[in-house]
Amino acid sequence: MCIRDRANTFKTVTFAAEPASAGTPYVMYTVAGSTTTVILGLRVTNIHTTSVTVEVELVSDTANRGGNNNVTNGTAFLAKDVVIPAKSSLEILAGSKIVMETTDVLQIDCSVADKVSGTLSVMEIT
């Protein structure tokens, strides 16, 4: 199947107050089977009365690509220990795009439980 024959679906994923417990990342998105996802944007808002520290991770175990790129992916930080002031928002990707493969996970953690809200925009290619 040629990529131009595949369906592109735009989606928005929102979360109101996460993670439930500081130190336990909240899974924002998991790529479905037979799907490639392009992250178009991620905006995170601090809903707390003081600054919080945020981490955004891409967790991937994709492997078996063949050729010179036949290595297993791991966890990559898209944001690490980023301070967001009280009542402020941060655009994590700021114009960049990230490709996610089947079973990849995007997750967020915060220094204080239930104090970040956000919107994730993606395009799924199926």
What are the residue ranges of the model-derived segments?
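Short, small-residue-biased leader/transition segments that mark boundaries at the very start
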Residues: 1-3
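Solvent-exposed, conformationally flexible loop/turn segments
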Residues: 8, 20-23, 85-90
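Beta-rich globular "head" domains
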Residues: 24-59, 115-123
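Local beta-strand/beta-hairpin segments that build beta-sheet-rich folds
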Residues: 9-16, 25-32, 67-83
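Intrinsically disordered, low-complexity Pro/Gly/Ser/Thr-rich segments with frequent PxxP/GP/PP motifs
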Residues: 62-103
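Short acidic, glycine-rich loop/turn motifs
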Residues: 58-63, 110
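Beta-hairpin (beta-strand-turn-beta-strand) motif
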Residues: 95-96, 111-113, 121-125
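Noncatalytic modules at the cell exterior or secretory-pathway interfaces
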Residues: 40, 98-115
